[in-house]
Amino acid sequence: HDCKHQPAPYFRKKFSVGNPVRSARIYVAVAGLYQLHLNGRRLGDTMLDPVYTRFDRRNMYVTYDVTSAIKQNENVVGIVLGNGWYNHQPLAVWNFEMAPWRNRPAFCMDLHLTYEDGSEETVCTDYGWRTTDGGAWRKNNIYTGEFYDFSMQMEGWDKPGYDDSKWGGVRLRQAPSAQVTSQQMRPIRACREYPAVKFAQLSDNAYLYDFGYNMAGVTRFRLKGAKGTVVKVRHGERLGKDGRLDQSNIDVYYRGDKETDPFQTDVLTLSGGEDEFMARFNYKGFRYAQVEASAPVEIDKESMVACFVHSDVPQVGEVRSSNKLIEGLMAASNQAYLSNLMGYPTDCPQREKNGWTGDGHLAIEAALYNFDGITVYEKWMADHRDEQQPNGVLPDIIPTCGWGYGTDNGLDWTSAIAIIPWNLYLFYGDTKP
């Protein structure tokens, strides 16, 4: 399929193990995003892997220790791929739809097995894999959301014994870049959950959740309705005068079709049973979530929680004061900073999700006083090296698909390449970045 094809690709491979296993590791590199499975279980607790890079110059691989998950006899490894930054489908103003790397998401993987007798075996990405686009993920995009059809879930697709005879074969292609490096940084996780502080029914089939805090992340929820009911979950930061969600402050750069591919909205088709959903290939900036259903659904205040998603950097500093306003301002500042840390520092978690260099270096001192973020900034400095032209020119946003070179922002922005390494040295004594 070409890059305009929307359903997410699923892949699976069977392999047999006949000897006791001493160790097993998976190394997986993906152009796009992924969710990795082994013998019916999703691996890891991270999100939005691998982190965003300039795909035609550097790709990241992630490592998993799966020794305890390997079984004797038949095993199955499976993966679902999301578009992420690799394959932008709706239009925005930064020309990502014209990125030189743009293509359908793809992956390569090695599963290294070491047996107790010292022998070794590698299960790799070859023609032995099977694939389909007939699963529940019908559409996904980093700016808009996910379309998920519960009636199309393939029960047991990632387990031994599943009949994949109707699945197709795979096609091999080159990696986007010859440089594939280990992702050595604090991963992105859903680090905190917020229950709704307010819940309101707006009409017969519309509901509003208020989580009390502005954040980057996703919602996790369960609901029940008739099979085929379409539920839209819209996310935003403010309400209009009518008490309904208002996205007009955050969708200003979006150029896609707001009816067929709405901004910051997950669109679900229900199975008829109790369905549970959490977006995996997308994140939003929001405080409120508005649920709109095509038919009645069973839903209440406890049906939905907000998941605060960001690079999982440990907090190393804090401010304590008898003045609660100061403490509140610091808490809000830290919440805003973490909402803009997704493997690189961003300007906002909704409108753009771009790594504006000026924003990044202006926040570096506040960042390092409060959080152990060196691995994120080491990665971002590598992104700077990927983007720097032979004459030294840098773009305004990093990573970029080519947008942002030759603007009038100048040193106020691109001095990030000096200011951030200098601050990493001041805080850590580290001369490497």
Which positions does each model-derived feature cover?
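Glycine-rich, acidic and aromatic/proline-enriched surface loops and short helix-turn segments
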Residues: 32, 335, 339, 369-390, ...
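Well-ordered alpha-helical scaffold segments within catalytic/enzyme domains
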Residues: 362-373, 417-433
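Functionally critical mobile loop/hinge segments
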Residues: 351, 355, 367, 381
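Aromatic-lined, polymer-binding surfaces characteristic
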Residues: 353-360, 386-398, 405-421, 425
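Extracellular/oxidizing-compartment recognition motifs
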Residues: 1-351, 358-359, 375-378, 395-405, ...
